[in-house]
Curated annotation (Swiss-Prot):
Keyword Cytoplasm: yes
Top-rank lineage group of the source organism: Bacteria
Protein name according to UniProt: Anti-adapter protein IraM
GO biological process, one term: cellular response to starvation
Subcellular location: Cytoplasm
UniProt entry keywords in alphabetical sequence: Cytoplasm, Stress response
Entry function: Inhibits RpoS proteolysis by regulating RssB activity, thereby increasing the stability of the sigma stress factor RpoS during magnesium starvation.
Family label: Belongs to the IraM/RssC family.
InterPro entries xref list: Anti-adapter_IraM, PmrD_sf
CC per GO annotation: cytoplasm
Length: 111
């Protein structure tokens, strides 16, 4: 079954991601992976993770719940990533980030 990613939020201090996905039902999944699931991407589940862009990527899924707008807004409002800011310097100022590579292309600010 193919799943379409609607939205994704990353909590970089713990490496957990949350995504709204849709196939025949809209769900919220929270997971840990080196893979970033950008909006509009399409993936399928495998026994070892997900198939995204013709690559099998390991994913640990912690929970899946039916989509709830209030719950999703709570997740989005607690987001630690500065993805929606007008960051002219292209730098991340989140000193607690554990991600090796920023999925948004930001560079870690030096202390």
């Amino acid at each position: 079954m193919k799943w379409i990613v609607i939205d994704t939020v990353i909590q970089p201090s713990c490496g957990i991601s949350f995504s709204v996905i849709w196939s025949k039902i809209k769900l919220i999944i929270w997971y840990q992976s080196d893979a970033f699931l950008p909006p509009e991407s399409i993936f399928t589940l495998t026994h070892t993770g997900i198939m995204l862009n013709n690559k099998v990527l390991p994913v640990t899924i912690y929970n899946v719940v039916p989509f709830n707008k209030t719950f999703w807004n709570l997740i989005k409002n607690s987001q630690e990533c500065p993805t929606n800011t007008d960051n002219v310097l292209n730098e991340c100022f989140n000193n607690r980030c554990t991600l090796q590579i920023c999925p948004y292309g930001l560079k870690q600010q030096s202390p």
